[in-house]
């Protein structure tokens, strides 16, 4: 026979919870000896909703305490190794409302990049079965129509969070590197029979780092066109912290150059682009629509206000 403290340790419960279960006759064979309960060595842990939820489990009873995902922007890692607040209902909201292009403005450290990576992992076509990262999340309980969207689209993902330089040349070089890396994620296009030779030549220029500024401004439009041809469906384009290089340009005296570049860059991606399923942008500020999103009438702005 064992006492409540010993059973509590074995079952991962508090001693008080085990004592209450004994009082309610929920543990077979438990008997009270004086002021203490004695429980058979082979007693079975009772099925109880409060217990399976983990609400009463103590850290001291063997539960591993997870760290907070501070500075973690990798969705797969965050939901597996850290305390993760389920934000997957954001996916349902998009699929219900179907805004073509969405802009999210939030202060720093509001989880913008993590949420965008969540969208990428959910929607992106992958050789890996990525549904396993959502099967225990809220979105998976919303029905087949939402589950059927998982892993069904090519995705273009860029984050400008580290584009912080003192000159336009250094900024453009970094953007060139980011595009080179993103094009590299889609190497299947280089050998695709559905892609024209002139498109493969352009693809190679980006991959080899030989693209001019004009080539770079057209890169999102070109890449989305090639992905549509290859996969037979238009991609989702995600741009994280789009305004970081713009803020740097404003403070470092190359604002005109970065605004001119971004206007053409985003116009090709989001304005009248038939090769686009959804577009998502995040940033701290909402740059005046006239300066950078000129003519983009399908932009839905989501702010904290």
Label the model's feature ranges.
Residues 9, 23, 229:
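Short polybasic/polar patches that bind polyanions
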Residues 6, 43, 241:
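Ca2+-coordinating acidic residues in Ca2+-binding motifs
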Residues 1, 38, 84-85:
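Short aromatic/basic micro-patch
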Residues 12-38:
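Major-groove DNA-recognition helix of helix-turn-helix-type DNA-binding domains
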Residues 1-17:
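Polyanion-binding surface elements
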Residues 4, 29-30, 48:
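A generic structural signal for ordered secondary structure
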Residues 59-305:
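Phosphate-binding site recognition
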Residues 42-61:
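A short, Lys/Arg-enriched interface patch at domain edges and termini
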């Amino acid at each position: 026979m064992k006492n409540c403290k010993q059973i509590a340790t074995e079952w991962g419960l508090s001693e008080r919870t085990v004592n209450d279960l004994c009082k309610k006759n929920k543990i077979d064979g438990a008997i009270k000896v004086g002021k203490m309960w004695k429980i058979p060595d082979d007693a079975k842990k009772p099925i109880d909703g409060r217990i399976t939820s983990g609400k009463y489990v103590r850290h001291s009873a063997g539960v591993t305490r997870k760290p907070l995902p501070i500075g973690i922007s990798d969705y797969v890692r965050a939901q597996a190794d850290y305390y993760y607040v389920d934000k997957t209902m954001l996916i349902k909201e998009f699929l219900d409302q179907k805004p073509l292009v969405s802009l999210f403005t939030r202060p720093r450290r509001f989880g913008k990049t993590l949420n965008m990576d969540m969208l990428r992992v959910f929607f992106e076509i992958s050789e890996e079965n990525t549904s396993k990262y959502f099967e225990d999340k809220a979105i998976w309980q919303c029905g087949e129509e939402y589950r059927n969207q998982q892993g069904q689209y090519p995705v273009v993902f860029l984050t400008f969070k580290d584009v912080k330089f003192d000159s336009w040349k250094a900024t453009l070089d970094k953007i060139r590197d980011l595009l080179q890396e993103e094009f590299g994620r889609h190497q299947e296009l280089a050998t695709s029979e559905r892609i024209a030779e002139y498109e493969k030549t352009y693809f190679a220029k980006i991959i080899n780092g030989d693209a001019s500024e004009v080539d770079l401004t057209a890169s999102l439009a070109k890449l989305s066109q090639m992905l549509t041809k290859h996969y037979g469906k238009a991609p989702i384009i995600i741009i994280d912290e789009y305004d970081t290089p713009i803020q740097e340009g404003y403070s470092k005296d190359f604002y005109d150059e970065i605004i001119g570049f971004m206007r053409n860059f985003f116009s090709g991606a989001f304005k009248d682009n038939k090769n686009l399923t959804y577009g998502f942008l995040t940033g701290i500020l909402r740059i005046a629509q006239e300066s950078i999103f000129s003519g983009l009438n399908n932009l839905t702005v989501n702010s904290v206000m």
